[in-house]
């Protein structure tokens, strides 16, 4: 199981949003590159980077900063935010990003999402963000009217390489993960699942680890918890390694 430390970029700073709301942000660092290096030093095996400016504007905003992050760490980077065409996808892959996270267009433009999966096999994943069980789009602003199980068969057929499932109700709230919902999804999904939203303490790591052993759960993303100290990334990675050695 992989714990993905998150670096969310807004206005050139590393921030966290509460339940994805642009007006409810906490700035954790004025230097996202230093933060990326820090999480690698703490034992991170992957880095989860989101261009929040891009997510809200629909176009890449922090491309040069992201290129610098990729060049500054030796661990792979997965990136989301504002990637809504193949040209942008290619540019980020050329900049050193290992794999890309597609959100809105996976739901609103299935043909384009399928084309991206075909063009960059194994490197395109999807982020599905749910509130009250319903998928949201465009930076969690619009309700798609769909559930995750409405779209899962198509995403599987199109070749999505991984699936990030965010529980908006719990994101940034440090209220713990929804183990039941994640377990069901990891069992039903042929696509590796990554949990996001609510990962707050070692107890969440303990709760998710058995799911990763018995079902298709690849890991979990954590942000606010590792910045504020309720979860120690190095401790979490040591614990996981001790179970899988």
UniProtKB/Swiss-Prot annotation:
It is found in: Cytoplasm. GO terms for cellular component: cytoplasm. The active site is at residues 8, 129. It is an enzyme of class 5 (isomerase). Pathway: Amino-acid biosynthesis; L-histidine biosynthesis; L-histidine from 5-phospho-alpha-D-ribose 1-diphosphate: step 4/9. One of its GO terms (molecular function) is 1-(5-phosphoribosyl)-5-[(5-phosphoribosylamino)methylideneamino]imidazole-4-carboxamide isomerase activity. GO terms for biological process: L-histidine biosynthetic process; L-tryptophan biosynthetic process. Pfam families: His_biosynth. Its EC number is 5.3.1.16. The keyword Cell inner membrane does not apply. Gene3D superfamilies: Aldolase class I. Its main location: cytoplasm. It catalyses: 1-(5-phospho-beta-D-ribosyl)-5-[(5-phospho-beta-D-ribosylamino)methylideneamino]imidazole-4-carboxamide = 5-[(5-phospho-1-deoxy-D-ribulos-1-ylimino)methylamino]-1-(5-phospho-beta-D-ribosyl)imidazole-4-carboxamide. InterPro entries: Aldolase_TIM (IPR013785), His_biosynth (IPR006062), HisA_bact_arch (IPR006063), Isoase_HisA-like (IPR044524), Isoase_HisA-like_bact (IPR023016), RibuloseP-bd_barrel (IPR011060). The keyword Cytoplasm applies. SUPFAM superfamilies: Ribulose-phoshate binding barrel. Keywords: Amino-acid biosynthesis, Cytoplasm, Histidine biosynthesis, Isomerase. Belongs to the HisA/HisF family. This is 1-(5-phosphoribosyl)-5-[(5-phosphoribosylamino)methylideneamino] imidazole-4-carboxamide isomerase. It comes from Oleidesulfovibrio alaskensis (strain ATCC BAA-1058 / DSM 17464 / G20) (Desulfovibrio alaskensis).
